[in-house]
């Protein structure tokens, strides 16, 4: 049957297109829909906007050599004809039809009826549970080349899951017996046999099952929990933060060590003004030019001089000219015995040591000697 349908389908498509184009002017503004219900009844409906308030008539035949018959079972919409129902049980025929306004053809065409097949909804659907799987069965239809599709979902699923077989014996595995599942079944015609214009059957009634027992309904889908920061993400973030901190600390330590081992070299331009700007780095010319105008640069933070330089005046004179001295008895005895006066020795402190004429002096930065 499948091969025959495909072979005849191509011929009828070309023939139907030629016949429709032959009446192209009359077909303007008319849209049709054909549904072949379970290979039993053909329904042809039309939407003629140009003839919305007109009772159009439908004429048909199943053989190109026969005369047209007029429809006897019209569909009405707002009191006007909008379609026709034809009895065509188990027929693989071409439907020739013409929609007319009185005797004037409005739309004329021919179509292979099985191209618009719509199977009936599955009947006698049964469920057989075994552990974590369920087998769905129903009564097979009298014709073949069909797909039986079972869809199911639990309140925790966001979309329907689907499985289909060539016969109405579909086993679904991997189910959780503690969950409640909703099921429904439908039948579809194979596209490679009947073409792309067929219609799937209506869905069967929804059936709910839990723990192998039928339920009136499944609970509503629970609200998904708010996303929480997982331990892995938290630990990873802390590890990255620690690594970055250690890296920054290492760079700071490296900078400190580099600064300690390799001190910064001062810029000679600030120490020798004019050496490079005026003398082009010639130190001999620079020292000649600046030897009489050298400035004393004090170090920053150096102690300010507290006063003028203190002169240290040394005068060599006779000891007899000195003023009378008061001597104690022990001193007089030592002098009388011819010994010289010995002063206690104390360490010299303060600065540079200068010896002049047997006298020793300690000089600081604010002293000078005048002879």
From Swiss-Prot:
It holds the Pfam family TSLPR_D1. Residues 322-336 have a biased composition (Basic and acidic residues). One of its GO terms (cellular component) is external side of plasma membrane. Keywords: Cell membrane, Disulfide bond, Glycoprotein, Membrane, Receptor, Secreted, Signal, Transmembrane, Transmembrane helix. Induction: Up-regulated in activated peripheral monocytes and THP-1 cells. It comes from the Eukaryota. A motif (Box 1 motif) lies at residues 261-269. Residues 253-371 are cytoplasmic. Residues 322-347 are annotated as: Disordered. This is Cytokine receptor-like factor 2.
């Amino acid at each position: 049957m499948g091969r025959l349908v495909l072979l005849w389908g191509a011929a009828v498509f070309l023939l139907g297109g030629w016949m429709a184009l032959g009446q192209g002017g009359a077909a303007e503004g008319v849209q049709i829909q054909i549904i072949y219900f379970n290979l039993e009844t053909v329904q042809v409906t039309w939407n003629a906007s140009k003839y919305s308030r007109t009772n159009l008539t439908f004429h048909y035949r199943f053989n190109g050599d026969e005369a047209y018959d007029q429809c006897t079972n019209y569909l009405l919409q707002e009191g006007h004809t909008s379609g026709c129902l034809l009895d065509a049980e188990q027929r693989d025929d071409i439907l020739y039809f013409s929609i007319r306004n009185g005797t004037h053809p409005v739309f004329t065409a021919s179509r292979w009826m099985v191209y618009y097949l719509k199977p009936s909804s599955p009947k006698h659907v049964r469920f057989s549970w075994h552990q974590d799987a369920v087998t769905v069965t129903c009564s097979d239809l009298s014709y073949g080349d069909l797909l039986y599709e079972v869809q199911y979902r639990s309140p925790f699923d966001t979309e329907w899951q689907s499985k289909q077989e060539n016969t109405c014996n579909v086993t679904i595995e991997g189910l959780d017996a503690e969950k409640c599942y909703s099921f429904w079944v439908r039948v579809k015609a194979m596209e490679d046999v009947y073409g792309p214009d067929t219609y799937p059957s209506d869905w069967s009634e929804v059936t709910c099952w839990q723990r192998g027992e039928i339920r009136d309904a499944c609970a509503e889908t629970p609200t998904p929990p708010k996303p929480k920061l997982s331990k892995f993400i938290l630990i990873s973030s802390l590890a990255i933060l620690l690594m970055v901190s250690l890296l920054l600390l290492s760079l700071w330590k490296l900078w400190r060590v580099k600064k300690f081992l390799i001190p910064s070299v001062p810029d000679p331009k600030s120490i020798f003004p004019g050496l490079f700007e005026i003398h082009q780095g010639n130190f001999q010319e620079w020292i000649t030019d600046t030897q009489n105008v050298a400035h004393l640069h004090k170090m920053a933070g150096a102690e300010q001089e507290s006063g003028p330089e203190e002169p240290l005046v040394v005068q060599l004179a006779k000891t007899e000219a000195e003023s009378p001295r008061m001597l104690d008895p022990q001193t007089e005895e030592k002098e009388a015995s011819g010994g010289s006066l010995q002063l206690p020795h104390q360490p010299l402190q303060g600065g540079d040591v200068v010896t002049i004429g047997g006298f020793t002096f300690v000089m600081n930065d604010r002293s000078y000697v005048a002879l």
